[in-house]
Amino acid sequence: MAVVIRLQGLPIVAGTMDIRHFFSGLTIPDGGVHIVGGELGEAFIVFATDEDARLGMMRTGGTIKGSKVTLLLSSKTEMQNMIELSRRRFETANLDIPPANASRSGPPPSSGMSGRVNLPTTVSNFNNPSPSVVTATTSVHESNKNIQTFSTASIGTAPPNMGASFGSPTFSSTVPSTASPMNTVPPPPIPPIPAMPSLPPMPSIPPIPVPPPVPTLPPVPPVPPIPPVPSVPPMTPLPPMSGMPPLNPPPVAPLPAGMNGSGAPMNLNNNLNPMFLGPLNPVNPIQMNSQSSVKPLPINPDDLYVSVHGMPFSAMENDVRDFFHGLRVDAVHLLKDHVGRNNGNGLVKFLSPQDTFEALKRNRMLMIQRYVEVSPATERQWVAAGGHITFKQNMGPSGQSHPPPQTLPRSKSPSGQKRSRSRSPHEAGFCVYLKGLPFEAENKHVIDFFKKLDIVEDSIYIAYGPNGKATGEGFVEFRNEADYKAALCRHKQYMGNRFIQVHPITKKGMLEKIDMIRKRLQNFSYDQREMMLNPEGDVNSAKVCAHITNIPFSITKMDVLQFLEGIPVDENAVHVLVDNNGQGLGQALVQFKNEDDARKSERLHRKKLNGREAFVHVVTLEDMREIEKNPPAQGKKGLKMPVPGNPAVPGMPNAGLPGVGLPSAGLPGAGLPSTGLPGSAITSAGLPGAGMPSAGIPSAGGEEHAFLTVGSKEANNGPPFNFPGNFGGSNAFGPPIPPPGLGGGAFGDARPGMPSVGNSGLPGLGLDVPGFGGGPNNLSGPSGFGGGPQNFGNGPGSLGGPPGFGSGPPGLGSAPGHLGGPPAFGPGPGPGPGPGPIHIGGPPGFASSSGKPGPTVIKVQNMPFTVSIDEILDFFYGYQVIPGSVCLKYNEKGMPTGEAMVAFESRDEATAAVIDLNDRPIGSRKVKLVLG
């Protein structure tokens, strides 16, 4: 429904285009702007919808052409009444204007002369006599002579004392050449007119001696005697003079005030143009008032430009011209980003404001395959974008050329120049949106980031979350466009050790985002604020939240509440995670009132939720916020949950040899950074129970050893790769340790390049294992262990293996002094050569081509420098990470490098983590996972 708004305070120099620019972005139909004027400078604007009118009312107090305007709600009835009242006031004012000779000195014309006002009817049919030939239309002698003839001679010698009779409003307009002297020189007094005798019949008028000849007039009937002043009857109209030029030249100026007493058009049988302004003497025309002369309106240079947003990046200048087909496009300038590519925006210059006005009607129309926005622009924007200005002689409506507007250079002083429209309310403002700010960032850091740029005072806004911590978002407004463009060029530059994203944003969009942030803070419940502001409880570290995963993508809040039935949960505390398109991610976050309720929710782990097993994990408030900002993605295996390990064996937990650091299906204590025991590189394996460093073997070399031996700077990190199990003492092995007489020397004694027993640099790892050498005794695991296909050769001496050790040959050595293993991990001799082998129980598939190899290390790169070990463990939640194996890397100055090493219990687990979590974010950065 159309809504009418009343505007007051409109300056006299403003037009409809200025009003439309003031309400740019709102829908005003054609013919919807009505300027009434008056003392208050009123105008009425008709908006297409209620929403447009509401947005328009919000612009009250703005300026049009430097004048502050006020907006009021109105109606169509009031608008029509005001327009009609203004029209009547104008007509009444014209009727009240006195005639041109109203101020003359001298006696008024006598009543007897009133009959002469009909004399103009005698010349109404003089079809366009030339003003240079005829200077008057009739003449009546004031003497007692009889009128014998009617000729141009008598017309041209009309006595000046007849000026009073020509002063009537209906006749004075026909002789404008005498108006000026009549106003300044008073006419002589008119003598009394004696009574005229009866006039004889007038003879026929001879032809006028002016070519072409004028046909004779019919005889004039005799005038009866009229006492005291005879009245002259109207004469018969003369036939048209075909040879005379027209009397009605085209208008050259508006009618000056006072020339026509009534202000109404001249009524000479309506044969003359009512706007006839040509003087009777073209050689010496009347000097009109400069204010009333017709001059072409000066063209505001800002009315020639429009801005186009949202164009396809592949759009060229021809596409823009095709989009504005039918309009006169002067030039097109496509804007580019800092790399030199089209950014989808551009400026277009037209030849006339009418073309600009028509171009604005094409807002939100299709260009190629995208809908573009067309908005007004200024010449200042055109110049700032690199556009060129060509000065041309602008042709006005009257065909007169006038110099181009002086627009460059513009001084800062507004005096003497037309003010630019760039400061009008419809401008978007020079605002930017910052993302990725450091959490400890303050206003001074933002000012330093945009140093040497002019920032609007108190315009820096840094967003904070409900917990009082910065969210990494911010807004800045600049004073001018040059600084604004320079700020956009600092996109992805570093503030401290984090790069900042700088995005353009309109001032309206900035205010909406700030308002949304404030509403988010206001909607946060009072209880939650109290809990977070309570320093005693340290709620941030309390696990009062739950992360529910592996649920259907179409899940809703009500479904989650029904799933948590029996646990008190506020509806506003349930958040279903969605992506940027509003599609569900199959995850939900729930915040409970206390830890007891959160622990109760763990009972629902792996319960069915809409047909799928829901995984419920209890997390802290900080974890919940991090998950809400960067939801973890579900890979092929989903959000993996811990799976039960191998069944425990008495004396051998986790189906390994904890005494030698074998917590699972390999030798994690051996510090195998790659695949456990590669076939040709057995030197990369070590037994920490036998005095080998758990982080690797120095002789192995490589980056990972040096990486893992760097001391951690965090107190909770502990020694690198401190694997579970007892690495020292008499109870290190599950089975009893063989007596010292079983063999001479230790593991490392017979192996060149291996560190000697007890030389481990890690506490608790230096265990002298007496007698893993040759001898007739066995050290074996329980009989329940399945068969491993490899054998270890027996006997003291070197520890070696033939080529292809990892590929599963029948035996790993036939000479005495080798270490072998039985096929069934049980007592009894194996098929491998060598008498009296010593059997060491190993996990299934150890150093074989089948089953799971040993622990595998993953290198994590490109992490935030402030990342903690807990955050890394949360990132790998659901994968079998060896506890205590996370090691952060620091440089020589002790600063974090954003890299870490994480050990997994098997290579399959590490491979799955790399496939599922590579390029996933930790904080605001995507991490890279490299399999060791």
From Swiss-Prot:
UniProt keyword Nucleotidyltransferase present: no
Top-level taxon of the source organism: Eukaryota
Pro residues biased stretches: 824-836
Amino acid composition bias (Gly residues), ranges on this chain: 783-811
GO molecular function, one term: RNA binding
GO cellular component, one term: nucleoplasm
Cited SUPFAM superfamilies: RNA-binding domain, RBD
Metal-binding listed as a keyword: no
SMART domains in alphabetical order: RRM
Polar residues: compositionally biased ranges: 408-417
Swiss-Prot/TrEMBL GO biological process terms: regulation of RNA splicing
Segments forming domain RRM: 304-379, 430-507, 856-932
Subcellular location: Nucleus
Ranges of compositional bias, category Low complexity: 98-116, 717-734
Xref: InterPro entries: ESRP, Nucleotide-bd_a/b_plait_sf, RBD_domain_sf, RBM12_RRM1, RBM12_RRM2, RBM12_RRM3, RBM12_RRM4, RBM12_RRM5
Modified sites of kind Phosphoserine: 352, 375, 420, 422, 424, 525
Region annotated Disordered, chain positions: 97-116, 393-424, 717-853
Keyword annotations: Nucleus, Phosphoprotein, Repeat, RNA-binding
Listed name of the protein: RNA-binding protein 12
Organism expressing this protein natively: Macaca mulatta
Gene label: RBM12
